[in-house]
């Protein structure tokens, strides 16, 4: 079945027809052909994609990507631990909010939504606040499309003996990285992002030695990362509670398609080509990106809304949707913007078609 429109969003995103077709069969969650041949293969493939180093393992967790973030924060931190959160967007802020809900001591460095964190400030905070045990940062902050300097932040954290939690929700699978080389202790992502699966579960790739220490720490039964991992380890991929079977099977297919494309490096190149073409074309149409080019990720781009008095995002959105494209509203608190993603089953020819559709959607210039 073909889609009526292309999702130019940071996830859920447009998937291939073969990924969607993978969900047309039912699976028994007790059978080896599901647990051993799908779930366990997924777990191994994820670790291989994340790092060339040994000592890492993976665990899948039902729910949204945020559920996996909360499972990690809530299962990793001791009552005496303290979290430093780098917050330059809605998703960094969400990590701090999770810590607040769970009564976890938290300190926040917030440089603003359009600025990268100051590395000297991070080092200074870690030097003068020895209570901090963990540092959390978002890799691609889709509030704006900014790519944060995770290598530099992780290096500083490790120099101060801290554990690092990386929210790679919108980057893993689409941007090359080796979390072992970076010193990441826990990395979190989701099925419906750069791997190009469908929503339904997230996953955590962690140092085995760190995850082994998390027994009994969880503040939630459902979101107990350690118990979920132990269940999968001891029962060959079995989930503690109902497994999202159709989503899992679609994700397995998406992983195969990532390999067929040439792996993460090839997918990154496609995303980068999409984003470069998008920004060039949008500039030619009179739209200005929110961020300077050096801060852009290849995942999603924020553009300032036109200042014309007749412009309304809802009308603009509908005119694009009628032509087969769905974009995202803005999320920046201090600027009127909209966002366009270029991940998922999106290719340069799709960006070309979008730019053509844009010319017909700019109704405020046609009056």
Swiss-Prot record:
Gene3D superfamilies according to UniProt: Aspartate Aminotransferase, domain 1, Type I PLP-dependent aspartate aminotransferase-like (Major domain)
Assembly, per entry: Homodimer.
Domain of life: Bacteria
UniProt record, GO biological process: organic phosphonate catabolic process
EC numbers for this chain: 2.6.1.37
Catalytic activity: (2-aminoethyl)phosphonate + pyruvate = phosphonoacetaldehyde + L-alanine
EC top class named in words: transferase
Protein name in UniProt: 2-aminoethylphosphonate--pyruvate transaminase
Positions carrying N6-(pyridoxal phosphate)lysine: 193
Pfam (any one): Aminotran_5
Keywords carried by this UniProt record: Aminotransferase, Pyridoxal phosphate, Pyruvate, Transferase
Protein's UniProt keywords contain Transferase: yes
Molecular functions (GO terms): 2-aminoethylphosphonate-pyruvate transaminase activity
Record-stated family: Belongs to the class-V pyridoxal-phosphate-dependent aminotransferase family. PhnW subfamily.
Cofactor: pyridoxal 5'-phosphate
Provenance organism: Vibrio cholerae serotype O1 (strain ATCC 39315 / El Tor Inaba N16961)
Function field: Involved in phosphonate degradation.
Signal peptide: none
């Amino acid at each position: 079945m073909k889609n009526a429109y292309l999702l130019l969003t940071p996830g859920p995103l447009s998937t291939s027809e073969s990924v969607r077709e993978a969900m047309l069969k039912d699976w028994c969650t007790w059978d080896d052909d599901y647990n051993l041949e799908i779930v366990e293969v997924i777990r191994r493939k994820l670790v291989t994609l994340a790092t060339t180093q040994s000592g890492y393992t993976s665990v899948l967790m039902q729910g949204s990507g945020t559920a996996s973030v909360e499972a990690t924060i809530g299962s990793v931190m001791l009552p005496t631990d303290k979290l430093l959160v780098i917050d330059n967007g809605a998703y960094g802020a969400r990590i701090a909010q999770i810590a607040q809900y769970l009564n976890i001591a938290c300190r926040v460095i917030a440089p603003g939504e359009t600025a990268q964190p100051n590395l000297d400030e991070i080092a200074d905070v870690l030097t003068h606040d020895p209570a901090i045990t963990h540092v959390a940062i978002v890799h691609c902050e889709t509030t704006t499309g900014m790519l944060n300097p995770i290598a530099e932040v992780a290096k500083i954290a490790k120099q101060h003996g801290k554990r690092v939690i990386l929210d790679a929700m919108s980057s893993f699978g689409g941007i090359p990285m080796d979390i072992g080389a970076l010193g990441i202790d826990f990395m979190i992502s989701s099925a419906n992002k750069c791997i190009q699966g469908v929503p339904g579960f997230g996953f955590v790739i962690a140092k085995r030695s760190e995850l082994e220490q998390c027994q009994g720490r969880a503040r939630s039964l459902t979101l107990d990362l350690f118990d979920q991992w132990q269940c999968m380890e001891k029962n060959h991929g079995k989930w503690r509670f109902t497994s999202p079977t159709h989503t899992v099977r679609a994700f397995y297919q998406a992983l195969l398609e990532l390999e067929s494309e040439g792996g993460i490096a090839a997918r990154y190149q496609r995303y980068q080509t999409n984003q470069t073409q998008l920004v060039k074309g949008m500039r030619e149409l009179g739209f200005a990106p929110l961020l300077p080019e050096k801060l852009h990720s290849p995942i999603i781009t924020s553009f300032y809304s036109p200042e014309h008095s007749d412009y309304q995002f809802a009308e603009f959105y509908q005119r694009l949707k009628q032509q087969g494209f769905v974009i995202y509203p803005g999320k920046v608190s201090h600027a009127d913007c909209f966002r366009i993603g270029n991940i998922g089953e999106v290719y340069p020819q799709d960006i070309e078609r979008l730019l053509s559709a844009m010319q017909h959607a700019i109704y405020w210039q046609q009056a």
